[in-house]
Amino acid sequence: MREVNVGGLQCTQAVMTVLREMVSMEEGEEIHISYEEPNARRDIMAMVKRRDYTLISEEEKLIILAK
């Protein structure tokens, strides 16, 4: 399991930080993404929809994905 905290990052920086981690994930691996900005959540979820990742859970300020 990987953990990424993008709290305090601007939307583009948050997305790029998450993407760097996601591309090196192994099949079946999970990533826990914590964020603060609602716009970061929106942009991260838009990126996830364009790629082959599974949303496991979405809670307040936490997104859990799997490859």
Question: Model regions: which residues?
Answer:
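Intrinsic-disorder/low-complexity, polar/charged segments enriched in Ser/Thr/Lys/Arg/Asp/Glu/Gln
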Residues: 1, 30-32, 62
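An N-terminal amphipathic alpha-helical segment
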Residues: 1-25
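Glycine- and other small-residue-rich loops at beta-strand/loop junctions that grip anionic moieties
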Residues: 7, 33-36
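Loop/helix-junction capping segments adjacent to catalytic residues or to phosphate/diphosphate-binding pockets
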Residues: 12-15, 38-42
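Short glycine-rich, basic-tinged beta-strand/loop micro-motifs
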Residues: 24-34
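Short glycine/proline-enriched coil/turn segments at helix->beta-strand junctions
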Residues: 27, 49, 58-61
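Short, charge-rich amphipathic interface segments used for partner binding and complex assembly
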Residues: 36, 42-56
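C-terminal edge-of-domain segments
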Residues: 55-67
